[in-house]
């Protein structure tokens, strides 16, 4: 019973981490006040204003996170016990897509 509670706890922590990661990463990756202004004197003046995309790079962050957790969690599970090692890949196959879908739906619901 204790191993199943541990598995459930780890799964909940994993899913919550993925669901709340877009909010944290968007704040870290893009500064909303970033602007680039340039002037050219060849034929006149030209201004260039750049805008930061708050969702830039999130796919690669989630990919790296999934790969790292995919390597680390089964190794830890094998040390905890063979029952957990059998159940964990099934949980990860279901939890990761579910968490990604939840994150996408959360991004769509946020006002821009």
UniProtKB/Swiss-Prot annotation:
GO BP terms: namely: defense response to fungus; defense response to Gram-negative bacterium; defense response to Gram-positive bacterium; hemolysis in another organism; symbiont-mediated cytolysis of host cell
- A cellular component term (GO) from this record? extracellular space
What are the start and end residues of every segment in region (Critical for cytotoxic activity)? 57-78
**Keyword Ribonucleoprotein found:** no
Instruction: Give the region (IgE-binding determinant) as residue ranges.
Output: 93-106
Q: State the compartments where it is located.
A: Secreted
Q: Per its UniProt record, what Pfam families does this chain match?
A: Pilosulin
Q: Which tissues is it found in, per the record? A: Expressed by the venom gland.
Q: Which UniProt keywords apply?
A: Allergen, Antibiotic, Antimicrobial, Cytolysis, Fungicide, Hemolysis, Secreted, Signal
Signal sequence region: 1-26
Q: Which residues form the propeptide?
A: 27-56
Family note: Belongs to the formicidae venom precursor-01 superfamily. Ant pilosulin family.
Could you tell me what this protein does?
Has strong cytotoxic and hemolytic activities. Is more potent against mononuclear leukocytes than against granulocytes. The synthesized peptide 57-76 shows a potent and broad spectrum antimicrobial activity against both Gram-positive and Gram-negative bacteria, and also against the fungus C.albicans. Adopts an alpha-helical structure.
User: Can you name this protein?
Assistant: M-myrmeciitoxin-Mp1
């Amino acid at each position: 019973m204790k191993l199943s509670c541990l598995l459930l706890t780890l799964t909940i922590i994993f899913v919550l981490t993925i669901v709340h990661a877009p909010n944290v990463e968007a704040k870290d990756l893009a500064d909303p006040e970033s602007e680039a202004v340039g002037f050219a004197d060849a034929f006149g003046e030209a201004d260039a204003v750049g805008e930061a995309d708050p969702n830039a790079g999130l796919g690669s962050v989630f990919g790296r996170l999934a790969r790292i957790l995919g390597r680390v969690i089964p190794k830890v599970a094998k040390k905890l016990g063979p029952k957990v090692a059998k159940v964990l890949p099934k949980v990860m196959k279901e939890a990761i897509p579910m968490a990604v879908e939840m994150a996408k739906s959360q991004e769509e619901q946020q006002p821009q």
